[in-house]
Regions:
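Short alpha-helical basic/polar micro-motif
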Residues: 3, 200, 314
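Conserved serine DD-peptidase/penicillin-binding transpeptidase domain
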Residues: 10-294, 409-413
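Small-residue-rich helix-loop
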Residues: 58, 241, 253-256, 260-414
Length: 414
C-alpha cells in the first residue's frame, strides 16, 4: 500500500477527487423520471462508513437527497450500475481463493459501496442455552441471503463456530456453537458483484425515502445494449474526498480495497485503461524516474495481498527517502499509522518514547510481517527504517514485539 499510495499521491496530486455522474436516458416530467437512473462509476473508493464517521447511511442519504432536490418522486425505469471504468477482474493476481469471504479480500469494481462487505453484530441470547445467536447486519439489505445455524453454549471451552459465503453467490451463513461468555462480537462478510450490490442498496434507500422505483437494479454488463452516454443527461455529480484523505484511509487502517482501486485509477487516468496491469506500468515508470532500483522490485497488485510481490527493505527505505524529499511529504507521512495513537499500530509500543514518534506502515500475511516508516529520535531527528520478517513459524503476534523493540530503540536515540 505504501508503494501504491505514494504513486497515486505524487502523480494525481493531493487534491485529486473522483467524480461520479448520476445520469438518465429519460426525461423528468412532474416529478417522474421517465427513464433509467444510471450510476456511471468512477472507481471512487470513498463510499464507505470509514469516510463518514462510521455511518453507513451518509453517502446513500446524500444520493437520495440530491434526487429529491431535483423534484424526483418516482423513477419509471431501472437503477443501473456501470462499473466499466475498470476491468472485470475482481481480484488481484495471486490472491488466495479460500479467503474470498473475508473483508480484506472483497471484490474490486469500478462501482462499490462500503468496500463491498457487510459487518455483522453477534449477540448471544443468555436466557437459555441452545437458543439461536442473534445476528444483526449493520447494513440491512435484501441483497444477501443469510442462514443462521449458530446457537449459544455455556463455556468458552465448548465454543466452535464459523461463518462464510458460498463461492460466487450472496448466500452467507453462520453456524456452530457460540459461548455466552464471549458476549457481543463482530464479524464481516464480503458480497458478490459490487456493482449490482450498489444499485440494489440505492433502490432500497430510495424506496425507504418514499421515492417510487418501478424497475429493478441492473449491472450494466447484463444489458442487451450498451449505454450510449451521448444520449443521456447528467442529473448530478458526486465528488469524493481529496486524495490526501483517501491515502490516509488506505494506509492508517490498512484498506486493501482502497489501495487496489488507486492502482486501477492510475491505469485509467494515466495509462491505457482501468486495470491493475496498466496501473503497475505507471507505478514502475514513476519509481524508475525517482532513481529507485526497479530491477529488484516486483509488484503484482496494489495492496500487498499477493504472494507474488517481492520487495526488500532497501526498496522500501529508498521509497521512504524519496517521499521525504518530495513536495507532498507532509500528506504522505500524515497518512501513516502512528504508534500508540492511530491506525494499525495504535496499540503498539505503548509507554515508550515511540508513541507519537513512530509513523510506520504495517504489512502482514501468514508467516510474513513488516513495519516500515519514520521514527523521530529524542532530539527530533527523523530516521527511516524498514523491518521485514519472512517465512517465520512463530506467528506474527510474536514477531511484532521484536519490530516494536527496534522502533523503540530508534526513538530512544538522542
Amino acid at each position: 500500500k505504501m508503494y501504491t499510495t505514494a504513486a497515486a499521491l505524487c502523480l494525481l496530486g493531493p487534491e485529486y477527487r473522483y467524480g461520479t455522474d448520476f445520469v438518465t436516458n429519460g426525461t423528468l416530467d412532474n416529478g417522474i423520471l421517465k427513464g433509467d437512473l444510471i450510476i456511471r462509476g468512477s472507481g471512487d473508493p470513498t463510499w464507505s462508513e470509514r469516510f463518514y464517521d462510521s455511518n453507513y447511511d451518509s453517502v446513500m442519504v446524500c444520493f437520495v437527497d440530491s434526487l429529491k432536490a431535483l423534484g424526483i418522486s418516482e423513477i419509471n425505469g431501472k437503477i443501473i450500475g456501470d462499473d466499466n471504468v475498470f476491468d472485470d477482474l475482481h481480484w488481484g493476481a495471486g490472491w488466495m481463493w479460500d479467503d474470498e469471504y473475508e473483508w480484506h479480500y472483497a471484490e474490486l469494481s469500478g462501482l462499490s459501496f462500503n468496500e463491498n462487505y457487510i459487518d455483522y453484530t453477534l449477540i448471544p441470547d443468555s436466557s437459555t442455552i441452545g437458543n439461536p445467536v442473534i445476528i444483526e447486519p449493520l447494513l440491512k439489505t435484501s441483497y444477501i441471503n443469510l442462514r443462521n445455524d449458530m446457537v449459544t453454549v455455556g463455556s468458552k471451552a465448548e465454543e466452535d463456530w464459523r461463518y462464510g459465503r458460498n463461492h460466487s453467490t450472496n448466500d452467507c451463513w453462520f453456524e456452530g456453537d457460540y459461548s455466552i461468555q464471549s458476549g457481543v462480537d463482530e464479524a464481516d462478510l464480503t458480497i458478490h458483484n459490487p456493482t449490482l450490490f450498489t444499485a440494489h442498496v440505492l433502490k432500497e434507500y430510495l424506496l425507504d425515502a418514499g421515492i417510487k422505483v418501478n424497475g429493478n437494479p441492473v449491472d450494466a454488463d447484463d444489458l442487451i445494449d450498451s449505454i450510449d452516454y451521448e444520449q443521456t443527461s447528467i442529473l448530478f455529480t458526486y465528488i469524493s474526498h481529496p486524495m490526501s484523505r483517501v491515502i490516509a484511509e488506505a494506509n492508517q487502517p490498512s484498506s486493501n480495497h482502497i489501495a487496489e482501486t488507486l492502482q486501477k485509477t492510475l491505469g485509467n487516468e494515466l495509462g491505457e485503461g482501468g486495470t491493475s496491469k496498466e496501473g503497475l506500468k505507471i507505478q514502475m515508470a514513476f519509481y524508475d524516474s525517482l532513481g529507485m532500483d526497479v530491477e529488484n522490485l516486483y509488484l503484482r497488485d496494489g495492496s500487498g495481498l499477493s504472494r507474488y510481490n517481492l520487495v526488500s527493505p532497501s526498496n522500501s527505505t529508498s521509497l521512504l527517502q524519496v517521499m521525504w524529499d518530495h513536495d507532498y511529504r507532509d500528506d504522505f507521512v500524515k497518512s501513516f499509522p502512528i504508534a500508540g495513537v492511530i491506525g494499525s499500530i495504535d496499540d503498539r509500543m505503548m509507554g515508550s518514547n515511540a508513541v507519537g514518534s513512530v509513523h510506520a506502515k504495517t504489512g502482514n500475511m501468514t508467516n510474513v510481517s513488516s513495519l516500515s516508516g519514520y521514527a523521530w529520535t529524542k532530539s527530533g531527528e527523523p530516521m527511516i527504517f524498514s523491518i521485514m520478517v519472512n517465512n517465520h513459524m512463530t506467528g506474527n503476534s510474536k514477531v511484532k514485539p521484536l519490530q516494536d523493540k527496534i522502533a523503540i530503540i530508534l526513538s530512544d536515540m538522542e
